A protein has these predicted regions:
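HotDog/MaoC-like acyl-thioester-processing domains
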Residues: 1-24, 71, 86-172, 241, ...
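Hydrophobic residues on conserved beta-strands that form the core of alpha/beta folds
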Residues: 31, 138, 228-230
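Catalytic-pocket segment enriched in acidic/His residues
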Residues: 195-246, 250-252, 260-265, 271
Length: 277
């Protein structure tokens, strides 16, 4: 399995000519005989709010490993635009059974589809994790390489009309991104320190979108238990740190709907659904 630090060196310091206005080809990568670290799992569970019993993985943890293959694809010569110009729009994870921390895994990732949109180039990365020949976990991530369109203004997203249950309020400290990076191995500079995020146009450090998804899902695990399920999220407004956010959910047919919002409960950062398979 490739090191994210070495991949980020290529991503940050390698030169890309820019998007050539062409769809992307299919790109496939695989890592076999992947073994997990109990210590890293515990760190991840702690920073994301999961209870780790030493056996069953937090459902979002395997994304940490899938993203290493995503980063490998991002360094492919056919990807002619920089990683730092991309936006993670949405993510779907399907858990077909609980995965044990001592299992040997095969992780596959494929850039499967790309399409031109008014906002730029959208593309999908499909990730699969297998134990022997059994598919146990799958994810679909949709990214956007955005292009600026003169005169085009995006409307800010609005929170949904949701009957919140058991509303939580969380304080996100400025060092959250560094703690998540240590646990996940994902050292994207915009999540680490204000001095680094300012280099990319952000006055404050941003929370990682997949941390937000994991933190939200950790609050719903008492309902999910060991059932097979799918969790879909759309990433809305960025979360700057330090800050406070609110989280709530409601019951829907065959699952839960949830949101992470600003402290006033008006502006959405994350919207998602859990459905049982």
């Amino acid at each position: 399995m490739p090191s994210l630090l070495s991949l980020y060196r290529k991503i940050l310091f390698g030169r890309k000519p820019g998007w050539d206005q062409q769809p992307l080809p299919t790109i496939y990568v695989q890592a076999s005989n992947v073994m997990l670290s109990q210590e890293k799992i515990r760190q991840y569970a702690e920073v994301c709010g999961f209870e780790f019993d030493g056996v069953t993985l937090p459902p979002t943890y395997l994304y940490v490993w899938a993203f290493r293959l995503h980063a490998t694809i991002f360094t492919h010569k056919a990807v002619t635009f920089p990683l730092l110009g991309m936006i993670h729009l949405k993510n779907s994870i399907s858990v077909f059974r609980p995965v044990r921390s001592d299992e040997t895994l095969t992780v596959q990732c494929e850039l499967s589809d790309s399409r031109n949109t008014d906002s730029g180039l959208e593309f999908d990365l499909v990730s699969k994790v297998s134990v022997a020949d059994e598919l146990v976990w799958q994810a679909l991530s949709t990214y956007l390489y955005r292009i600026d369109t003169p005169g085009r203004r995006a409307r800010p997203p609005k929170a949904s009309e949701m009957a919140w249950q058991d509303v939580k309020q969380w304080r996100l400290t400025e060092d959250l991104g560094r703690r998540y990076a240590k646990a996940s191995g994902d050292y994207n500079l915009i999540h680490l320190h204000p001095l680094l995020s300012k280099r990319f146009g952000f006055e404050r450090v941003l929370a990682h979108g997949m941390w937000s998804k994991a933190r939200a899902l950790s609050q719903l695990m008492t309902f999910i238990g060991d059932k097979p399920f799918q969790v879909d999220v759309e990433f809305k407004l960025p979360v700057f740190m330090p800050s406070e956010v609110t989280f709530g959910f409601e019951s829907i047919e065959n699952g839960k709907r949830f949101e992470m919002r600003d402290v006033k409960g008006r502006r959405p950062h994350l919207q998602g659904n859990v459905t049982y398979l």
